[in-house]
């Protein structure tokens, strides 16, 4: 699937949209760098998230720490031009 992170300006909320297919319900976990060689499971999900507490810059950036559970799939986050 594909997930998009859009932010019009540093002061505007981040809009997260995407569609991933074949997944059971799980947490959504993103790392700047990571090993995606440990992939398994096939699943599906649609998501759209936005809010003033989401930002891609500064102290309040989307860096959240927690336990999302076992990895069921992995992907690469890149910048589209």
From Swiss-Prot:
Tissue specificity of this protein: Central nervous system. Coexpressed with CCAP in most CCAP-specific neurons. Coexpressed with pburs in the large bilateral lateral neurosecretory neurons of the first three unfused abdominal ganglia and in all anterior bilateral cell pairs in the thoracic ganglia.
Keywords (A to Z) from UniProt: Hormone, Secreted
A GO molecular-function descriptor: hormone activity
Transmembrane segments: none
Subunit structure: Heterodimer of burs and pburs.
Coiled coil: none
PANTHER family attached to this UniProt entry: SUPEROXIDE DISMUTASE CU-ZN -RELATED (PTHR10003)
Organism: Periplaneta americana (American cockroach)
Subcellular localization: Secreted
Designated name of the protein: Bursicon
GO BP term, example: chitin-based cuticle sclerotization
SUPFAM superfamilies: Cu,Zn superoxide dismutase-like
Protein's job: Final heterodimeric neurohormone released at the end of the molting cycle, involved in the sclerotization (tanning) of the insect cuticle, melanization and wing spreading.
Cellular component terms per the entry's GO annotation: extracellular region
UniProt-listed InterPro entries: SOD-like_Cu/Zn_dom_sf (IPR036423), SOD_Cu/Zn_/chaperone (IPR024134), SOD_Cu/Zn_BS (IPR018152), SOD_Cu_Zn_dom (IPR001424)
